Amino acid sequence: VPASARLQRINSFADVAACLRNMRSDVAWIATGVCFGAYESARDYVAKRSQFGKPLGSFQLVQEKLAHMLSNATASLAMVVRLTQQQEAGIYRDENSAMAKTFTARMLRETAALAREVCGGNGILLENSVARHHADAEAIYSYEGTHEINSLIIGRAITGVSAFR
């Protein structure tokens, strides 16, 4: 690769890995924010929608799904706050960002699906913010290392053995 086409301050794969570590942390925060957004969109939808002459938010299963969504978002927030504390303390490693990215993206994916469910058919309409959150969840789940790759990074830290070939 000619010198003119090289990224500045990137001299080895270790430099690339450091960039990915930092980006995974950012993605974990993004996933957490979108997770709260999906929950809030669903909560707002059920607050103004009626079904069978009753507020949609009064149905037991809708309330259970809202509770599940808020729990997912809150757990994600705890994970990224801890990640930030690790960064600030200088004890931040690849597996920390991989774990946060993997966990928050999975919680987002689940929360977006639940939000879509409580909105029924309106949850798949493109003008509905729930549909946008659902699409964002799929993208976030995949970029800056797929769920599987990040799981292997975590597994390597747990076992001391790399599954990468």
What are the residue ranges of the model-derived segments?
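C-terminal helix-coil-helix/basic helical segment that borders enzyme active sites and/or dimer interfaces
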Residues: 47, 51-54, 70-103, 116-124
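Glycine-rich beta->alpha junctions and the first turn(s) of the following alpha-helix
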Residues: 1-74, 139-140, 156, 165
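Generic, well-ordered alpha-helical scaffold segments in large soluble proteins
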Residues: 41, 45, 86, 114, ...
